[in-house]
From Swiss-Prot:
Motif ('KMSKS' region): 268-272
Family: Belongs to the class-I aminoacyl-tRNA synthetase family.
Lineage start: Bacteria, Pseudomonadati, Pseudomonadota, Gammaproteobacteria, Vibrionales
Gene behind this protein: glnS
Catalytic activity: tRNA(Gln) + L-glutamine + ATP = L-glutaminyl-tRNA(Gln) + AMP + diphosphate
Pfam families, sorted: tRNA-synt_1c, tRNA-synt_1c_C, tRNA-synt_1c_C2
UniProt-recorded name of the protein: Glutamine--tRNA ligase
Cellular component, GO, one term: cytosol
EC number in record: 6.1.1.18
Oligomer and partners: Monomer.
């Protein structure tokens, strides 16, 4: 199979293949242009993987460009966060980072060119009046009384705007296109507005700022972008994209292509809704592991490879659809099953005493870090007379389907011996406080010599050497597949999206790296929290369970 055959195919790549074959372009140049007014989420990851992935596969270039034309909502904090997210996902931008603000002087010149051609005018209608004059989807708009000013007058007024001679909302520059167009975006859209706001790149040089639709296409052309790829909500904007480039003097002529945005079940992607979750403290910040932000997914334990694989699996189409959350979970589960070292942790502990094991003695057992990858090495796990096991792994009575520890029966401890439950001790309320067992000292790594069958295998942690840990069990943030469709999306938040437990982990996990994935035997995949975990207070986040438990719930 050739390298080209191995690439994922989609309609955008087919367009690129044809453009190259026809000689329309000799190379491919894409861009990822986020606005630095928030944190990137999994939907942005799809665009990142698409644009940077195309550049990689076609030996082309991809620019990271910040669409920084709205200084009131933007911050250098978001610039740094976005750079970190793109880099963490495994991509490198071409040359230096680009900013739309780098082109403010050129954009101003192109606006002047449109004015000179009679294709732009300064409007002094209020924002409310502009909306009123624009009309509706079923009724045409009506022209502004300022629409037919001369080029000379418009140039003077535009210069006055630039020099701070108008208050905010008192004047704007509009394109002169068609107030009766069936496309609202073509009804004399605003190109520049007055904003007395300091900019994180240009400081106080400007008090007028260009709109996205005017900036975007010109930035693409100035950077030599061959394929400008965006989501479907910008389909109508392509008409304005083309109109601007058709009416200014510029060499490069990029074209815009649209694909469907990512809609993921049990989450929201709207920046406004995500911001509401944070500001109303419904979650613990933008990097809360329940959030769909890249920083949140990273803190939860998702790997760059798993997110790239997810974006590859869902593909690129023009069809709007809702992707199952289990598809994302499947990608990280596959990744960690293959690559995560194993460890033992007890989340809901009950004490177990092995009465015939020497008191005060600790035996260091050698356990493989991965059952199928000997190259991942081994570790020592301390074994002692008193250990912790999961409360759910013991019953006084059980049917034959229960393959764990039952009073009077045997079970194997993972990586250790076969034990038999002899008796229990309870508190005044009837809760089991201690399980007393005996062990077969001849069963380390081998089956019982007499051939007797053992019911199953359970995990454990030494009570003497185990380390206390806070365990955070994360689940889906919402209880319904499409919370954005609810009248009050916040009312659909899952009250069990976070459960905190206090358990014990094997001592090797004291050295666990933040965000590095581990499979806690029989419990799921976890990582040390990057913000709250320390050697003095271990905190582990559940990334995903061993199996898709929601599939069973939804099937009922």
């Amino acid at each position: 199979m050739s390298e080209a055959d191995a690439r994922p195919s989609n309609f955008i790549r087919q367009i690129i293949d044809k453009d190259l074959a026809d000689g329309k372009h000799t190379s491919v140049h894409t861009r990822f242009p986020p606005e630095p007014n928030g944190y990137l989420h999994i939907g942005h990851a799809k665009s990142i993987c698409l644009n940077f992935g195309i550049a990689q596969d076609y030996q082309g270039k991809c620019n990271l460009r910040f669409d920084d034309t709205n200084p009131e909502k933007e911050d250098i904090e978001y610039v740094e966060s976005i750079k970190n997210d793109v880099s963490w996902l495994g991509f490198e931008w071409d040359d230096e980072i680009c900013y739309s603000s780098n082109y403010f002087d050129k954009l101003y010149e192109y606006a002047v060119e449109l004015i000179n051609k009679g294709l732009a005018y300064v409007d002094e209608l209020s924002p409310e009046q502009i909306r009123e004059y624009r009309g509706t989807l079923t009724a045409p708009g009506k022209p502004s009384p300022y629409r037919d000013r001369s080029a000379e007058e418009n140039l003077a007024l535009f210069e006055k705007m630039r020099d701070g001679g108008f208050e905010e909302g008192k004047a704007c520059l509009r394109a002169k296109i068609d107030m009766a167009s069936s496309f609202m975006v073509m009804r004399d859209p605003v190109l520049y507005r007055v904003r007395f706001a300091s900019h994180h790149q240009t400081g106080d040089k400007w008090c007028i700022y260009p709109m996205y639709d005017f900036t975007h296409c010109i930035s693409d052309a100035l950077e030599g972008i061959t394929h400008s790829i965006c989501t479907l909500e910008f389909m109508d904007n392509r008409r304005l994209y083309d109109w601007v480039l058709d009416n200014i003097t510029i060499d490069c002529r990029p074209h815009q292509y649209e694909f469907s945005r990512l809609n993921l079940e049990y989450t929201v992607m709207s920046k406004r809704k995500l911001n509401q979750l944070v500001t109303e403290k419904l979650v613990n910040g933008w990097d809360d592991p329940r959030m769909p932000t890249i920083s949140g997914l990273r803190r939860r334990g998702f790997t760059p490879a798993s997110i790239r694989e997810f974006c590859k699996r869902i593909g690129v189409t023009k069809q709007e659809n809702m992707i199952e959350f289990s598809s994302l979970e499947s990608c990280i589960r596959d990744d960690l099953n293959e690559n995560a070292p194993r460890a033992m942790a007890v989340l809901d502990p009950v004490k177990l005493v092995i009465e015939n094991f020497p008191a005060g003695e600790v035996e260091n057992l050698t356990v493989a870090n991965h059952p199928n990858k000997p190259e991942m090495g081994e570790r020592e796990v301390p074994f002692s007379r008193e250990i912790w096991i999961e409360r759910e792994d013991f019953r006084e009575e059980a049917n034959k389907k229960y393959k764990r520890l039952v009073l009077g029966s045997e079970v194997r401890l993972r990586g250790a011996y076969v034990i038999k439950a002899e008796r229990v001790e309870k508190d005044d309320e009837g809760n089991i406080t201690t399980i007393f067992c005996t062990y077969d000292s001849e069963t380390l790594g081998v089956n019982p010599a007499d051939g007797r069958k053992v019911r199953g295998v359970i995990h454990w942690v030494s009570a003497d050497k185990g380390v206390p840990a806070e365990i955070r069990l994360y689940d889906r943030l919402f209880t319904v597949p499409n919370p954005a469709a609810a009248d009050d999306f916040a009312s659909t938040i899952n009250p069990e999206s976070l459960t905190v437990m206090n358990g014990f982990v094997e001592p090797s996990l004291v050295e666990a790296e933040a965000e590095k994935g581990y499979q806690f035997e029989r419990m799921g995949y976890f990582c040390a929290d990057s913000k709250d975990s320390s050697k003095e207070h271990l905190v582990f986040n559940r990334t995903v369970g061993l199996r898709d438990t929601w599939a069973k719930i939804e099937a009922k």
